[in-house]
Amino acid sequence: MSKDINIVSRGTKQVGQRLLPWIFPIVLLVVWQIASSSGLLENRILPAPTAVVSAFWHLLISGELWQHVKVSAGRALLGLFIGGGLGLLLGLLNGSSRFASTLLDTTLQMIRNIPALALIPLVILWFGIDETAKLFLVAVGVFFPIYINTYHGIHSVDPQLIEMGKSYGLSRWQLYKEIILPGAMPSILVGLRFALGLVWVLLIVAETISAQAGIGYMTMNAREFLQTDVVLVGILLYALLGKLADVLAQLLERYLLRWHAGYQK
C-alpha cells in the first residue's frame, strides 16, 4: 500500500515539475485577455491573445507562415554553421597552440568588442542587401560565443590527464579524441546554447535589410499596415523557435555528455 502511495506521489511530483514552468505564462495570458476584453488595453496597441491566435491561424492555413519560417530557419542554420564552424575551429586551434593564440587571439578579442549591429552600414557597403549580408551578420554574431567557450574549454582540461595520456603513448589525435575534446565539450556546448539564442536576435535585425521573405520581413511588412496582431505573431515565433533550438541543444548536450556524472540519472 505504501509502495503504491509512493509511486503516485512521485508521479504527481513529476507532473507538477513539468507544469510549473507554464504557470506564469498561462496566468499572463489570462490577465492579458481580461485586460483586452475589458478595454484596458487597446487592440491597436496590444491585441487580445485570441486575435493573435486568429492571425496565426490565417497565416498558417494560407501557407504564408511556413514560407517565412522556412526562410528564417534556413538563414539561421546556415549562419550558425558558418560562424559556429569557424568559431569551433579557431577555438580548437588557439586553445591548443600557444603560437596561434598569441598571433590571433588579441585580434579576435578586439573584433569581439565591436557590436555586430554596428557593422550593418559597412556590411551593406560590402555585400549590398542580398542574402550574403544577412548571413554575414548572423555568422559574425554566433562566431564569438562558440570561439570563446571552445578556447576556454580547451584550457580548462586537467593538464594531469593530458600528461597521463602521453605516458600511455597516446598520439596527438588520440589525446584530442579521448581527453581534450571530452573535457572541453561541456564548455563548447554552453557556447552552442548561447549562440542558438543569439542567432534569432541577430536574425531579427538582419531580416530588416531589404528582405523579401522571412519572419522579420513579415513583421516589418505588418507594421507598415498597422497589423499589430501579425507583428506579435512574428515576435512569438522568434521566441518559440529560440526555445525549440534550446531544447534541441539540451538533448544534444545530454547525448554527448551521457558519460558525465552530472548528466546521469
Describe the predicted segments one by one:
Residues 154-160, 164-184, 224:
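Short helix-to-coil transition segments within interhelical loops
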Residues 1-24, 247-265:
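Transmembrane alpha-helical segments of polytopic membrane transport and secretion proteins
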Residues 7-14, 38-81:
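Periplasmic/extracellular loop-to-transmembrane helix junction in inner-membrane transport proteins
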Residues 98, 186-190, 232-265:
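C-terminal transmembrane helix and the adjacent membrane-cytosol boundary/short C-terminal tail
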Residues 109-145, 152-153:
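Generic hydrophobic transmembrane alpha-helix motif, especially the helices
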Residues 124-125, 154, 201-238, 257, ...:
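Glycine-rich helix-loop "coupling/hinge" segments at transmembrane-helix boundaries
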Residues 136, 140, 173-205, 229, ...:
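Transmembrane alpha-helices
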Residues 78-108:
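Transmembrane-helix boundary motif in ABC transporter permease subunits
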